Amino acid sequence: MKDYQRKKTKYILPAAVYHKTLWTIRDYHRLKDEVSTMITPKSGGGEGTPPSGDPGDPTYNLAVKYSQYLDIIQAIDEARNNIPREYDLGIWNNIQYGARYPQDAERSTYGHIKSRFVYEVAINLHFV
């Protein structure tokens, strides 16, 4: 699968930012899984356990990571809500799995909306 950016559109990003945004979108499901496992309590700790050797405040570090993941998920969800419903699944499957666009509209229509979606995610994540 070749990831290239459409040239004749107003949603142009630098190549590195475009690819970084695509891979951030592709990481969506892992981030959702990480967030769901972060909020489950973990056993261990307490007075009888040996120190972990990790410097700093592990609770604070976990909270920062949790907040960063939620910001990324929210940025992707906000941009995805701006995609017309009839094109949403086709664009999402194309980015996530490399699936072909459905035959219900022109490829150029899907390509234009995909470039706008990737551009909006990059803006929401403050990549540009």
Would you name each region that the model predicts?
Residues 1-82, 125-128:
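N-terminal interaction/assembly modules
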Residues 82-97:
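Short amphipathic alpha helix immediately N-terminal
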Residues 89-92, 106, 111-113:
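Domain-scale macromolecular recognition modules
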Residues 97-109:
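Helix-turn-helix DNA-binding module
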Residues 110-128:
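DNA major-groove recognition helices of helix-turn-helix
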